[in-house]
Amino acid sequence: MSLTRRDFIKANAVAATAAAAGIATPAIAQPAKANIRWDKGVCRFCGTGCAVLVGVQDGRVVATQGDPDSPVNRGLNCIKGYFLSKIMYGEDRLTKPLLRMKNGKFDKNGEFQPISWDQAFDIMAEKWKEQLKKPDGVTRVGMFGSGQWTIWEGYAASKLFKAGFRSNNLDPNARHCMASAVAGFMRTFGIDEPMGCYDDIEQTDAFVLWGSNMAEMHPILWSRVTDRRLTHEGCKVAVLSTFEHRSFELADIPMVFTPQTDLAILNYICHYIISKNAYDKDFIEKHVNFKKGATDIGYGLRPTHALEKDQANAATPDKSDPMTFDEFKAFVAEYTLEKVAKLSGVPADKLEALAKLYADPKVKVVSFWTMGFNQHARGTWVNNMIYNVHLLMGKISEPGNSPFSLTGQPSACGTAREVGTFAHRLPADMVVMNDKHREITEGLWKLPPGTLNPKIGYHAVLQHRMLKDGKLNAYWVMCTNNMQTAPNMNEEGYPGYRNPANFIVVSDPYPTVTALAADLILPTAMWMEKEGAYGNAERRTQFWRQQVKAPGEAKSDLWQIMEFSKRFKIEEVWPEELLAKKPELRGKTLFDVLYKNGQVDKFPATDIQAGFENDEAKAFGFYPQKGLFEEYASFGRGHAHDLAPFEAYHKARGLRWPVVDGKETLWRFREGYDPYVKAGEGVKFYGKPDGKAWIFALPYQPAAESPDKEFDLWLSTGRVLEHWHSGSMTRRVPELHKSVPNAVLYMHPNDAAKRNLRNGDVVKVASRRGEVTTRIDTRGRNKPPEGLVFMPFFDESQLVNKLTLDATCPISKETDYKKCAVKVSKA
């Protein structure tokens, strides 16, 4: 057999990745099968946005490989990516709607029984209409969506809830992972998403990882970081975390810090830069304003919680006041090397080495962060504070100098953020609270003035609280496993799902923990069973075509949303005063008003490329993906969120927005790279009215819950390489499941010895909210310091979120999954 260079690279990559995971080389590394049709696609997992080639034979995805023509992954995939072909074929795949029934009727305490789609939508419509007819009906219906939705699925859902039902109770699971990043961008720059791109990796001199285990969570990007570190003379890697993990293997400056003290470390770096007179005076004068942020903001817990008492700014956590550079200098001056070393537990020499990296004007620095920053009771603050460091030095918006927020889901950027599926957002960074933004949206959606609700809806954690309290009663969960992944499951999650006043619908391909807690389960088409689009962490939008059909009666989220809208006459959901403004809408359905509006339905099904299925086009008689995308794209064109025409994405390996005159943008806010920065402006942070970014003075504050005499250990939760999020896909891939079949509790050997425990012992882990049973691992890949334990959340047999606290960042409303107090004892 002869191998091309491409085949050789691919086979070696597969073998190396499989070997690293300790599993056998998969069949896809073997010679290709005959008669396979290959087409381009996008990986279903993390926010890196790796491109893949998808092989189809006899109506089934039989193989995938990294796309050699992709500028993101350059033909490589991580171990999860190499098994993509198996994620849709779990033995327990759902193929029919299932309703809890007893004696032939719906019963909240009944057993799941198969029903038809008509029956499913009948009872859904009944439950929704029952709530919507109440005086406060718009607050009693809600939806929890996903950063795994395709762009048009999120957009269609936003139209249905925010325009159709006039309810802003739509929030995505990206609230749990990216909301702090969004709030950080908006506060500092007035506009969302990174200014840099992955090309920064090959052009920088130093990498600093803040709360990010890229080696396991973004392994393809880590391979590029590793290559740069090993081939670029003098390149340095600094890694900061609350425990040691695989990314530490490459670290020149490894730092394990006490939870929450990253706030102090960031202020120390600013103090060092200023005290050494290293800051870029000209850049600061031209491009920066200084702000003192509000403190006493609480921890996002229920108002009755003790930590929320006497918090002066709990209602206005986002407010700030102007300050001068000298005032900022005085503010950070108290964060001395000695003080921060003692507080954080990081040796002084390492803190100083880190500060010197940032302070050296000749060293280009890329700062990467993920959940360690974002899932933080002060998550917005730490996002603001890393920008402080880069702005002081002017190390921003140019090749190799970039503060870079990495995303965890494949379209947390493209769908949750850009489309605006958060409870307060509209497309293209607009918000429901802004009169002008609502007016623009109503115009583009052809709605009567006053249709959109100006009141912010319930965010993710608040949705669970409102379900429990009986104030949110008709609830639809799509493309996410929130019962397993939301915090404080025992006290705030499960009670709301089982509240007799509520009707819970879950759309999912598999019987997840969330699905099994619902009243109605809708079987969902997956990944290559529908046409899709994702937007990755570097603003790259990528498309794929439907490759195969979904099994049985499973339907895409897009079909479900649009088909359900047919069940509502406009008179059933809108008040008379709205209808009077646009009487031609009388008698129409929400489907007619939202999706058959002359814009979404303007493209015929014949526009679909020959040889490919499109089940939604077949069902509706037009090309809904194209119509929805073009309507959505009209929000951002001319407003620094420009997307290319629909057809361009099926031809390209993704394009990074803004795309102006067919050209993508690699670096934002800097002249010569960004088309929205005019000649002579140099740098312009045009999200702010005066073009200046904000540096914030924000203090160190303790965590919402810290260890004490009884609960004497910190608990941090997260992921491992082999599994993704709740494991609903990866645990159904035999090779991945066998490699890591169960979660374990990673513990320092000394902490184990104090409790008379040995490696592999079965233990009980308890917090103030619940307990789980697991095994301890004192020799594994993750090495916590004494006083901290780490446990992944992929294992549905060990629901670690029974333990976690539902504290959130009061600004972003994102949960702090990294810090709560537990105790461990032998089971």
Curated annotation (Swiss-Prot):
Coiled coil: none annotated. GO terms for molecular function: 4 iron, 4 sulfur cluster binding; electron transfer activity; iron ion binding; molybdenum ion binding; molybdopterin cofactor binding; nitrate reductase (cytochrome) activity. HAMAP family: Nitrate_reduct_NapA. Substrate binds at residue 793. Keywords: 4Fe-4S, Electron transport, Iron, Iron-sulfur, Metal-binding, Molybdenum, Nitrate assimilation, Oxidoreductase, Periplasm, Signal, Transport. InterPro entries: Asp_de-COase-like_dom_sf, CT_Nitrate-R-NapA-like, MoPterin_dinucl-bd_dom, Mopterin_OxRdtase, Mopterin_OxRdtase_4Fe-4S_dom, Periplasm_NO3_reductase_lsu, Prok_molybdopt-oxidoreductase, TAT_signal. The gene is napA. One of its GO terms (cellular component) is periplasmic space. It comes from Paramagnetospirillum magneticum (strain ATCC 700264 / AMB-1). The keyword Cell inner membrane does not apply. This is Periplasmic nitrate reductase. It holds the Pfam family Molybdop_Fe4S4. Catalytic subunit of the periplasmic nitrate reductase complex NapAB. Receives electrons from NapB and catalyzes the reduction of nitrate to nitrite.
